Amino acid sequence: MNVNKFKSMKGKKPIVMLTAYDSVFASIVHQAGVDAILVGDSLANNVLGYSDTLPATMEDMIRHTQAVRRGAPEAFIIADMPFLSYQCSSDEAVRNAGRFLKEAGANAVKLEGGSFFSTTIERIVKSGIPVMGHLGLTPQSVNVFGGYKVQGKGDKSAKYLLEEAKALEEAGVFSIVLEMVVEETAKMITENLSIPTIGIGSGRFCDGQILVINDLLGMNPSFLPKFAKRYSNLFQISLEAVKNYVSDVQNHRFPFEENVFKAGE
């Protein structure tokens, strides 16, 4: 997979993406046949224990992107640019975006926001770094939105999102994530762009879909977004496995005969 092949899939075959944050899950996700892996800044609230994405740092993202690359050497990997890694200046944005390719082995970066960042995106792309855009609910701006709210509900909001999407396309992004955009608006945007849209909570008519791996696997039993589907219950499976281990040790059932070394072997 590369940027050109990714773009060519628009309207032909649904694009499948998932997040991954470490080498083990990167290997699983890649072997399962996803088209691209996103090392999301959702690392912060899915792995590092924070309540939202804002605390993720460049060093966090670089380190985990490196791990994902080690786990999936042949995968198409997109790395999220964390909060304040590109907002302060275009120079800093280019420098930080370049680190993901040079140090971490990413193929592209993703950044949130619309036309306000067009100049920054243009500079990053002209520096040889592919950029994926992100519109709709942009979690790094959750304090501006006043919460995690569905976007694009009215005609005015839908028109605004389309204009922003076209601005990103003109700036040079190769694809756009649409997050928590009402299905009708996401469909309209998808039909009016020449680049693929990747939906997360944005209905059935985007060019592709992405989910957070933790949601898909059921790793957080107390939370599941409306737009996600839980394909497993890994938290409960893991909990039962650890409970069985605790019980075996406490009741002298582990180690088993086959787990011990003996003299003369």
UniProtKB/Swiss-Prot annotation:
Pfam families: Pantoate_transf. Belongs to the PanB family. Gene3D superfamilies: Phosphoenolpyruvate-binding domains. This is 3-methyl-2-oxobutanoate hydroxymethyltransferase. The lineage of its organism: Bacteria, Thermotogati, Thermotogota, Thermotogae, Thermotogales. The active site is at residue 179. CDD domains: KPHMT-like. It is found in: Cytoplasm. It comes from Pseudothermotoga lettingae (strain ATCC BAA-301 / DSM 14385 / NBRC 107922 / TMO) (Thermotoga lettingae).
